[in-house]
Amino acid sequence: MRRSVLRLIILCLGVLLALGAVGLARLAESPCSPLSRTPCVRVLFLGNSYTYVNDLPAVFRDLARAGGQNVETGMVANGGETLAQHAASSDSLGAIRGSSWQFVVLQEQSEIPALASAWRSQMFPAAEALVGSIRAVNATPILLETWAHRDGLPGDGLDYAAMQVAVDDSYEGLGQDLGVMVVPAGQAWAAVLRVDPAITLWQDDGSHPSLAGTYLAACVLYARLFHASPVGISDTGGLSSALARTLQTVAGQL
């Protein structure tokens, strides 16, 4: 009996770990309040673990609601998923077409924007296809510029600063070519580190965001999407008030 229970526990843990590794597909969670006088803003996120770790859509939603916005979010994100994979995914394309999203946030795999050959051959054509699909349903595409790895890409001769410049250039160039808004989360990370290098924005792997990193990305998206500073919003995303205020301030100044 005990062995059977133990096997069941191990099986359940395995399933949970597998789900965490694969990622998430979640649509229309916590719908807009029908009682709110503020128009509903519906935002779909297409990304990978940079999006689903710490649940960026939920952090953004809570921040926006605390700022007086009536927001609903959805997400399709799998570990390591690229924009090219999203562009060929029935789940991603179905999510774009299946609900009345007003905005769709696109987040590319972290290394591709830093490598010129990968940017030209993979990121640009995939983003172009996705932007076309998004605009076909009268939604607005948004590019979420990511942050460099803490140690850059040593194998490609890029330290943190050089990788961030390359990522910035790729997203900004893509935004200009396709006429798409860019949310400069990566530039915000660099700005925060200039203000206080002791703030921990990465997890221990030096790649994925800490809770502070996710909150910062949410603040930058809030500032760009609503054309308003997040400074003073009461929702701190589980951070200290002082740290949240610092991140809000940097996001509001970009």
Please tell me what each predicted stretch does.
Residues 19-31:
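Membrane-interface motif at the C-terminal end of an N-terminal transmembrane signal
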Residues 29-42:
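N-terminal low-complexity, Pro/Thr/Ser-rich intrinsically disordered segments
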Residues 93-211, 223:
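Alpha-helical cap/lid subdomain in secreted, periplasmic
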Residues 201, 208, 218-254:
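Conserved catalytic region of serine esterases and O-acyltransferases that act on ester linkages
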Residues 53, 211-218:
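Short alpha-helical patches at coil-to-helix transitions and adjacent helical residues
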Residues 41-44, 50-129:
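Conserved SGNH/GDSL esterase-like catalytic core that processes O-acyl groups on lipids
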Residues 1-14:
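N-terminal Sec-pathway targeting helices
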